[in-house]
């Protein structure tokens, strides 16, 4: 800044000390300096005012610029957020665009498939229309042929109806003629029926007499068997005594037999075996004949009637039970079979209708080769021979249990109106029921004689195997019949 001008009071003080001329110059110079300073001050004031105005204007502009900058920052932030949203929207739109492209491809492929399917359906529709046309033509042809068949069969039915009416008329006339003939023959039928009934009674009497004779023969046979068994027992006892005497007399008897016969024999075993048989054989009870068996409790023995031979080896150990049949086992090596018997008979024991007959004494072991002829037979009779020994079971009944014995004929004049055969009874009536044994399949001969007594000919046990009866008729004389019961061991004509 310029120097501050000197005030007039100070100038006056200085001038007072100086001459008057110099003071005037100084005053003039001072006045001039004051004027200059005044002008300069005025100029500075004016410049100051101008600068103040400019400062206020610039401050206002600065404030407006600050406001604009804040607005620009806010607008920039808004634009940045909007840009980010736009970018996210663009990404979403790109994803949607990709999805839409894939959907468009799928739809185009589906469209192609639908076009192909539509073409196939169109082809099928055309084929169905053609088939329908063909079936329609066939249906029309079938309808036409059906009408022709209907007319044809209607004519045939009319013809058959006419023939049937004619046939019915003829049969009615024939039936009336037969009815009149039957009415005229009633008297002859009654006479013939009475004659047939009388003949039937005569035949029944003959059968009963025949059965009685057979029972007597079997009784005699049982007695003879008992005597033979006692005789055989005595012979065995004598043979055992002889062997004991020989062993006492010749202690080296076995060595001599081995030396001479080249066979080893155990005499002690033979003696013990014979003594065991003699101890288990008794003839205390008497054999009795029972006319009719108890069949209700015999069904459990049917399976044992056809048991095959078991335990056939020689000199097997025996159980302690009473034997009721005589069996000759294979004798030991070195001794003939007829020299030392291996078993002895015991007294026949009878259980219900069972009579025990030894095997070697039965005359029914071999079936007859040719059946014997008997006429007018009505009673079923069968004999079965069974034996066992050494726990062996020999059944001569084969595969038949002889459960039921019935005559099978195509026609029986002795049947009543109910289909049941009339049976004549003598003494106690013998039912033609099951014939089974209660003697645990021991050796026996089973005998049964049955006479029909008017009961049904069917037996209680219809499920077992049946002995078959074969009936043959003479074509020249129907009243004669050969009836035979077949058994695996023997057959008896009755």
From Swiss-Prot:
One GO BP annotation of this record: mRNA transport
Protein name, per record: SWI5-dependent HO expression protein 3
Gene designation per UniProt: SHE3
Species per Swiss-Prot/TrEMBL record: Candida tropicalis (strain ATCC MYA-3404 / T1)
Principal location: endoplasmic reticulum
Pfam families, per the entry: SHE3
Region (Disordered): 1-25, 291-494
Subcellular location: Endoplasmic reticulum membrane
Gene3D superfamilies found in the cross-reference section: 1.10.287.1490
Protein function: RNA-binding protein that binds specific mRNAs including the ASH1 mRNA, coding for a repressor of the HO endonuclease. Part of the mRNA localization machinery that restricts accumulation of certain proteins to the bud and in the daughter cell. Required for the delivery of cortical endoplasmic reticulum into the emerging bud.
């Amino acid at each position: 800044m310029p120097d501050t001008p000197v005030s007039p009071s100070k100038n006056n003080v200085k001038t007072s000390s100086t001459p008057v001329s110099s003071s005037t110059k100084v005053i003039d110079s001072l006045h001039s300096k004051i004027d200059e300073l005044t002008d300069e001050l005025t100029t500075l004031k004016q410049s100051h005012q101008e600068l103040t105005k400019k400062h206020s204007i610039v401050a206002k502009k600065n404030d407006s610029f600050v406001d604009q900058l804040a607005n620009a920052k806010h607008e920039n932030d808004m634009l940045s957020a909007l840009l980010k949203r736009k970018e996210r929207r663009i990404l979403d739109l790109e994803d949607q665009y990709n999805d839409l492209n894939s959907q468009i491809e799928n739809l185009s492929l589906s469209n192609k498939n639908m076009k192909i399917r539509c073409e196939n359906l169109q082809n099928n529709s055309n084929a169905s229309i053609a088939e329908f046309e063909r079936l329609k033509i066939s249906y029309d042809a079938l309808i036409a042929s059906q009408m022709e068949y209907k007319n044809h069969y209607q004519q045939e039915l009319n013809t058959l109806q006419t023939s049937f009416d004619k046939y019915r008329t003829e049969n009615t006339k024939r039936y009336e003629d037969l009815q009149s003939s039957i009415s005229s023959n009633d008297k002859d039928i009654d006479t013939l029926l009475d004659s047939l009934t009388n003949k039937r009674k005569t035949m029944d009497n003959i059968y009963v007499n025949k059965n009685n004779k057979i029972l007597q023969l079997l009784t005699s046979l049982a007695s003879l068997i008992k005597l033979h068994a006692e005789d055989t027992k005595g012979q065995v006892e004598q043979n055992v005594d002889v062997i004991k005497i020989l062993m006492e007399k010749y202690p080296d008897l076995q060595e001599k037999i081995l030396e001479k016969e080249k066979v080893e024999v155990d005499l002690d075993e033979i003696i013990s075996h014979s003594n065991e048989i003699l101890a288990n054989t008794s003839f205390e009870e008497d054999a009795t004949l029972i006319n009719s068996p108890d069949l209700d409790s015999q069904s459990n023995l049917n399976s044992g009637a056809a048991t095959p031979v078991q335990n056939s080896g020689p000199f097997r150990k025996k159980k302690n039970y009473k034997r009721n049949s005589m069996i000759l086992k294979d004798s030991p090596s070195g001794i003939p079979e007829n020299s030392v018997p291996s078993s002895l008979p015991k007294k026949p024991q009878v259980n219900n209708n069972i009579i025990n007959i030894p095997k070697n004494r039965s005359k029914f072991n071999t079936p007859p080769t040719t059946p014997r002829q008997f006429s007018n037979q009505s009673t079923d009779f069968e004999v079965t021979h069974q034996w066992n020994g050494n726990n062996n079971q020999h059944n001569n009944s084969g595969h038949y249990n002889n459960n039921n014995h019935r005559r099978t004929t195509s026609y029986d004049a002795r049947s009543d109106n109910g289909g049941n055969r009339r049976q004549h009874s003598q003494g106690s009536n013998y039912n033609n029921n099951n014939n089974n044994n209660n003697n645990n399949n021991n050796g026996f001969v089973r005998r049964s004689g049955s006479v029909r007594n008017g009961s049904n000919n069917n037996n209680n046990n219809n499920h077992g195997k049946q002995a078959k009866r074969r009936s043959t008729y003479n074509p020249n004389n129907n009243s004669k019949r050969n009836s035979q019961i077949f058994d695996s061991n023997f057959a008896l004509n009755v």
